[in-house]
Amino acid sequence: AVNDGSDAVDTDNWTEAQNVMCRDSYVQRKVLLELFSTERCTACPEAHHAIDAVTPDMDNLIEVGHHAGFYTDQFTIDESVAYEWFYPSYHVFAPAMLIDRMDMRNAFPSLFKYETPIMSASATNLKALYALEQKRPALVTVDLTTDWNPSSRSLGIDVSGEQLLPIATPDSLRLYVFLTEDSLYSTSQAGASAGFYHRHVPRKSLTPAWGEKVDVTAGYNRHFDVTLNDEWDEKHMRVVAFVANYNSTDPCDCSVLNAA
């Protein structure tokens, strides 16, 4: 106690050790936002509109919009369903989101309702967590280049990078690569008075659901070739890549180190 006496109630005391590193400079990280929503979610359009209103000011934000968490729909891919693992075992819901798959419950105890990194998707929550993540340096680089052949609709993708700062678990890092598409129009979106445009929809995962193991200490370089389906609009397609830790027994230990 502040008066040097005994703590009258010591059951609420807790301590946590944190490592602090001082450097002259660091590489700015990109922050990964993974949204979970579906066409059957009546609350999702309002949440999407609110989030879309604040993201233009977030220059370092990378987005993926999984169609899972509340049933599935025409835009769902298997990998998105696999990520329902980040929900508590007793409850899935939408709209929901992950920010860098980070467990930030100690920093924001009022925002996190469950024992996993998943939280309700809202502009307020996003702004708070994005601001905190922008203060964390990138631990690895993620460099992305593409080569598009319009005649064959083939896309070559190169992803490379290396370690920037010490990493606690370098042997458990995985690379994830997605093809996403914007401006997908739906006439069956619950909660929308008319049609609704879906953004950042994963069309294909080029790596397994839980990523491809990479050695960031030696530097990594991966090449992918994919042919875009005829119904995919290449003008609205983009490649998303990120490196994250993977612990198959703990969804709170799968944080993203950097994205592109």
Question: For each predicted feature, which ranges?
Answer:
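Extended acidic/polar, glycine-enriched regions
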Residues: 1-24
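Short, conserved sequence motifs used for protein processing/export or organelle targeting and
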Residues: 5, 14-16, 62-260
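The N-terminal extracellular segments of secreted preproproteins, especially immediately downstream
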Residues: 21, 40-43, 251-253
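Extracellular interdomain linker/stem segments of modular secreted and single-pass surface proteins
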Residues: 21-28, 181-184
